[in-house]
């Protein structure tokens, strides 16, 4: 396994962005890659986080046009308060209970984000 602290988490999102599959490759992640050559654009990323070590990634993904979601145990008042604070501060797009069934807020939010990503992609690739 690989230990993942907040610094490693940010490195992993850049690896995903650039299409680097090795968890141990720390050289290529710092190489410049043209936007049109990136495997997963930030604008097509959705980052879920549930703690303080996720805040840097949530902020970065959102800053580069992606979507960040703070999830929390609805029975834990402190976690809920923390997630709602991230939303108020503009660090995440959504703060929602960590429930993922088809009737949940998380399911609805993710479906809406996927539909938005697809619509943005379709608009960018129109040839009129």
Sequence positions of predicted segments:
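C-terminal cap/substrate-recognition subdomain and adjoining C-terminal extension
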Residues: 1-128
